[in-house]
């Protein structure tokens, strides 16, 4: 793909197929130097969506849906009225606004609901989780017994950072705006490594060149 402008950027079809698969998405590179760097980075390793023998083979999933599963959610006010064994049955539900780089509790819920819900930033990274909703662990359709890597899929290519990835502790569940990573084998080093790489400047640059307002699974796969 070429332009007639002298300052235009050209891409080869083999590169576009490797960069975005069947979608043939065109990266938003501002100069030939950026395009050359993009092509070099995309040619070094297999795409994340490719199955590789003895690789980590990452896949992504949404654990619960904030709309479809809302009848199973317990508001924080109702959760605080429960005591002892009743309260122990519930796990916190993570929403997208709670997740930032290396921090799954960036914001805490204060009051309200829907668009009028009030949240505030936690004073320090790793502060106690204060969600808006809880859910009975027995009603969650996935295993919550281990740490998982996650990311916030509501983001933007013009934000200070596009990729916001963190580690979710066991016995917590993620809403649909916080997809989680699964690997072929259970090894705590894999989600830790994925979070570190996802939050790097290199991966952030690669991702922001291919998305607008939602970070979808196919962006990662390609």
Task: Walk through the language-model features, giving the residues of each.
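Polynucleotide-recognition surfaces of large bacterial nucleic-acid defense/processing enzymes
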Residues: 1-148
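Basic, amphipathic alpha-helical recognition segments used for DNA target recognition
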Residues: 142-146, 154-162, 167-221
